[in-house]
Design a protein with these regions (language model features):
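Catalytic active-site module of serine/aspartate enzymes centered on a nucleophile-bearing elbow/loop
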Residues: 233-270
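Active-site glycine-rich loops that stabilize anionic/oxyanionic intermediates
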Residues: 15-18, 88, 211-212
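Conserved alpha/beta-hydrolase
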Residues: 31-53
Length: 270
């Protein structure tokens, strides 16, 4: 078992098209506050960004159950329930983990939706088009060009900033998972991203949304939050002028501090 620092543990879960490297600023900030910070990689993502771009075959093999089982195993190794934070697809995985009973509080940042959230803004269609335009992408790892990345992730960043972050963070994403998510609401039965929206035992959950996010716009965050009908705490916080890659955008410190303060306050009430 792990040795727990006085301040506790925070688990940061990355999304698609990036790796744990995308949390580098938040890791340093939270560690400076006395927290143990774990930023687990998806199965096969234990290598660097450059290696995944050179050989994306581990990405092609990804499944949602494999990712969530892996994350569950990571969280189970922590001595007391950690704070869970996730960005994009990582936000959906935070919701799935909370539904399984893990975590003292959860923060979902520009989160991908869980099953049943059927809102599809036009900006999301355009942002996801590189993956969805070709059904053959269901069996591939699909990357973005820089122009596509700039629209989907960094539309409020300068061109220079966007390119630097593209080169530092970008990796292909699983076409299979993305297609599965797109079709989830028309398939019968429970999908891989199913959660029990009436689960009264779930830890408090905060959705953080960037007002200018093209890939997972605020409308999705609000709709996802409204799906929860349990007696547990579910709140939404929106930041003006923020894009999808909120954890790396100028002013990220304000968001990181708010997320932590909210989680600390609501975790203590459990």
């Amino acid at each position: 078992m792990s040795t727990e620092p006085t301040a506790g543990t925070i688990v940061l879960i990355h999304g698609f098209w990036v790796t744990p490297r995308s949390w580098e600023h938040w890791i340093a900030r939270y560690e400076s506050r006395g927290y143990r910070v774990i930023a687990p990689a998806y199965p096969g993502f234990e290598v660097e960004v450059e290696a995944l771009n050179a050989d994306p075959s581990p990405i092609e093999a990804l499944t949602v159950p494999a990712i969530v089982d892996h994350l569950s195993a990571v969280v189970e190794e922590v001595d007391s329930p950690p704070i869970l934070m996730g960005h994009s697809a990582g936000g959906a995985f935070v919701q799935l983990l909370l539904d399984r009973g893990y975590g003292s509080a959860g923060v979902a940042i520009n989160s991908a939706p869980t099953e049943g959230v059927a809102v599809v803004p036009l900006s999301q269609v355009r942002a996801a088009f590189p993956v969805l335009k070709n059904p053959a992408n269901r069996h591939r790892a699909v990357g973005f060009t820089h122009d596509q990345w700039h629209y989907a992730f960094t539309n409020t960043f300068s061109e220079e900033e966007s390119l630097a972050l593209y080169e530092r963070y970008h990796v292909p994403a699983s076409g299979s998972i993305f297609w599965g998510s797109a079709l989830a609401n028309i398939h019968p039965g429970k999908d891989d991203t199913y959660v029990d929206y009436h689960n009264d035992d779930r830890a408090p959950l905060l959705f953080i949304s960037g007002s200018e996010d093209h890939l997972m716009p605020p409308k999705i965050q609000r709709s996802n939050a409204k799906h929860y009908k349990s007696n547990t705490i579910t709140e939404v916080k929106e930041y003006e002028g923020r894009a999808h890659l909120l954890p790396a955008q100028d002013g990220w410190q304000e968001v990181a501090d708010y997320a932590l303060e909210w989680a600390e306050g609501h975790a203590e009430s459990r």
